Amino acid sequence: ETLRQELVGELALECLLGNSTPLYARLYGQGLINSGFYYGYESYPGVAFLVAGGESKDPGAVRQAVWDEAARIGREGIDGGLWQRVKKGVYGGKVRSLNSFDTLCVGQAQAFFAGFRFLDFARLFDTITKAEAEDMIARWTVRERTALSVICPKEQ
């Protein structure tokens, strides 16, 4: 179950914030994010969260845009073509990462301590549905469950 949720989280984030999404293109085009924008899914015993970060001239506008897009996905769903592209891309990235001895070792160790088998991602991946990713986005990316931290340069 932990591995499944991690995979759903990764796919959900790629569909919401990935660099091939309309939201990313809009935010980048408006200069609200730059190429240093990042996002990820983290989980630990008893807690899991989605995170996004980077430099922005208006972090509040980025947060609002993410809320708005998450709400839209909750109402309308993820575009089917985007879902297929993201799913293939994420799977390909996971398979490519197996070429890295470090990634393989760290992944297996983390999975062992989390109670699952690292290489089971291949078996589970095809069973993950668009509806699961849509549900995660709709439930997790709401005002009551988000926080914004802004770090400003020290005045000189």
Give the positions of each predicted feature.
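Generic solvent-exposed, charged/amphipathic alpha-helical segments
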Residues: 9-13, 24, 67, 130, ...
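Histidine kinase transmitter module recognition
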Residues: 15, 93-97, 140
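M16 family metallopeptidases and their MPP-like homologs
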Residues: 24-75, 80-128, 145-152
